[in-house]
Amino acid sequence: VANDVETTPSAAFVKAAIRDMKAYLKKKGLSTPVGYADNDDMHIRMNLINYFNCGDKDSRADFYGVNIYRWCGDTADFKTSGYEDVTKNMTDYTIPSVLTEYGCNLVRPRTFPELKSLYGSDMGNTFSGGIMYEYSEEDNKYGIVKVNYGDSKVEKNDDYDNLKKALKEAKPKTIKIGDYKPSGKDSVCPKPSDTWHVKSEVLPPTPSSARCKCMMDSLGCTFKSENLSADEGKAVGEAVGHICGQTSCSEISYDTVKGNYGNFVACDPTQRSAWAVNKNYLNQNKAKCEVKGADTKTVSSPKQEDQAVCLKEKDDVGNAGSPSSNTGDSNSSGGGSSKTDSSDKEESGSESGSSSKNSSSTMLSMQPLATLLASAAALFYLF
């Protein structure tokens, strides 16, 4: 997830995943909304807010969540806590906004004074409620009950009763569907900058297992096993880093700032690494197929002679195949030659080979979200 300036390139892949999830759900006849939740970083907040609600409607988030822990204790208020600023950021937003996490625990027991604003006039016209973090008490001390796993009994703490009281006192204003007249404006996509390392108009390609398998079937030099050990993976990573430092690996690379995504960038790390090893094999006129620390093999007659054919394979959502935005080199493994341009130094937001940024996208499906909210409401109604 994009948690700071340096990790903003991950936003492109998260938005692509939203696009693909929505397309898949649509094909299955489902209309479950898919949203995104940010971590309330002041340096990238507005770029994220705008990015996930701009451009192609099929790629936009269906709702936007903010994980916020600013309102700490009863001495803070709507203005001093920073909630006012967050609310202003979402004014005129065209998709629902939710506090996907709230409940600062710097002052305990928590009394949840922010609920008066969240469900009152301060925020009620902008936010569609929120989710308190969290139910069970863990090491981080955010829970409202203590649980012993294997025991069905729970022990409520003061936070539980305080949250129950705050929710009971909340008086959210309802509105009839006929009176709902949205006045929001579509967001403008952010441009690449020192704090935003993404070309917003271009998204990574939808993964295609068939395309990646076809590519693997075209290689004349590859690994003996598709499942590399940890030691092999480390050795391969170093080898691919060296290879892609000497020659263009644009087919397995991406540059989010320029909006370039290789045709095989969505393949798994082993497949992308095999592509690079094969590229090196071709560059050496098939003289050597080896990676120190990993078992490799040569294939005298690959099943697929031309990688360009692989680009016609359907993606995993079922869409017809097409080349990615990258215009990098696509080579045949059997007997073709490969262009060996030296790669440009990578800018922030670019990556190649088998090394990939470990970022987990924070996407939410509204269906479980609605279930959670309903369960919470039932919980406090009953107890």
Predicted regions and their residues:
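Conserved residues at the C-terminal ends of beta-strands
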Residues: 1-2, 67, 133
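Noncatalytic carbohydrate-binding groove/subsite architecture in carbohydrate-active enzymes
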Residues: 5-120, 153-156, 181-193, 198
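Extracytoplasmic/secreted proteins, especially bacterial periplasmic and envelope-associated proteins
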Residues: 13-16, 20, 85, 113, ...
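Substrate-binding cleft of secreted/luminal carbohydrate-active enzymes
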Residues: 111-178, 272-277
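Glycan-binding loop/region signatures in secreted carbohydrate-active enzymes
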Residues: 141-153, 190-218, 238
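A recurrent domain-boundary module in secreted/ectodomain proteins
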Residues: 158-204, 297-326
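Secreted/extracellular ectodomain signature
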Residues: 201-343, 349
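Cleavable C-terminal sorting propeptides in eukaryotic secreted/cell-surface proteins
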Residues: 357-383
